[in-house]
Amino acid sequence: MKLLIIKIDTSYEVEDALGVFATDNLKALGIESRKRSDFEQAGWLHDSTVVEMDDIKDLPKDTYFYAYFDEEADKDELVEKFQAKLEELKSYGLNTGEGKITTSYIEDQDWNTAWQKYYHVIDFSRHLAIVPEWEDYQPAFSDQQLIKLDPGLAFGTGNHKTTQLAMMGIERAMVKPMSVVDVGTGSGILAIAASKLGATNVLATDISDESMTAAKQNSALNNLTNIKVQKTSLLAGVEGKFDIIVANILAEILLDLIPQMDAHLNKDGQVIFSGIDYLQLPKIKKSLDENNFKIDLTMKQGRWIGLAITRKEK
C-alpha cells in the first residue's frame, strides 16, 4: 500500500488550522509538521538530539506541513481544496508562507520508519519526558518519569499542542493515586502519562483497531500492567467511575461525551478536555453548563484550548 503525501511550504501561524482542515474536512490518514524552530530550539541545541548535516539543507524556511492520504485519493482535488483553504486563511490576514504545494507517494512501511529521524525526546516537564523507543535518554531530574513511545501512525506523539495541554491538565489533577479513564486514547500517551504520575488503575478507550494495538504496545513498552484497553465509542459500555476523565478529541466529539460523564465520574472527580479550537469553546461551555459542569481552569496554546472541569456545587 502506498500513501499520497501532500506537502505545503507554509507558516507556523496556520499550521493548526491546516491540521484541523486536513483531518476534519479532508479525512487525512495522518498529519505532520516540521518547523525550523523545532530543530533550532530542540534539535542541534538539545543534547539528546542529533540532526544530520544532510538534513539541515532540507529544513523549511518556516514550516512544512504534510498530510497523508490513501493512494486512491483524488490528488488534484485535494490540492485545489488546500489552495482554497490557504486563500481563505490569507483573507483573514494570516501569514500562509510561500504556499507552495507538492505531492508525492511513499510506501506505507517506509513512512513508518522514515519519519523517525524527525521525532526526538520531548522534555515535557520536571516530572515527564516523552522518549521514542529508538533513543537513549537519561532523565533530566531524579524524579522525572520517562514515557517510552512508538507512536507509528496513531495520533498522539506528544508533539502536538493538544496532547501537551492534556498532559498539563493531568499533572495538575494528579495530587494522589487516582483512577483515570482516557477517552479516545490514540497511541495511549495520556493513559501512560497518568500511570507514570501515580494513577492506580487506568482505562484507555478508542474506537480504532489501530489505536487499540498502539496503546497496548506502548503500555507494554513501558512495562505497565495497570492500563486496561477497551474498544468502544467514548464511554459506551464502560463500567465503574473514575477520579479523572481525560479526553483529547475534537470538540464535536466532546459534545457527545459530556452527557455521559456524570455517570462515570467519582464524587469530587475532575475532567480534562483538550483538542478544542478556540472557535468551538462557546458551545463546549454551553453544553458543560447544561450538564451541571463548570470550568475551573482554561489553558491555551496557539488556537488550542484545554480545560479543567468539575461538577457544579449543589
Curated annotation (Swiss-Prot):
A single GO cellular-component term on record: cytoplasm
EC number: 2.1.1.-
Organism: Lactobacillus acidophilus (strain ATCC 700396 / NCK56 / N2 / NCFM)
UniProt family annotation: Belongs to the methyltransferase superfamily. PrmA family.
Chief place where the protein resides: cytoplasm
Keywords tagged on the record: Cytoplasm, Methyltransferase, S-adenosyl-L-methionine, Transferase
GO biological process, one term: methylation
Cited SUPFAM superfamilies: S-adenosyl-L-methionine-dependent methyltransferases
Protein name per UniProt: Ribosomal protein L11 methyltransferase
Transmembrane segments: none
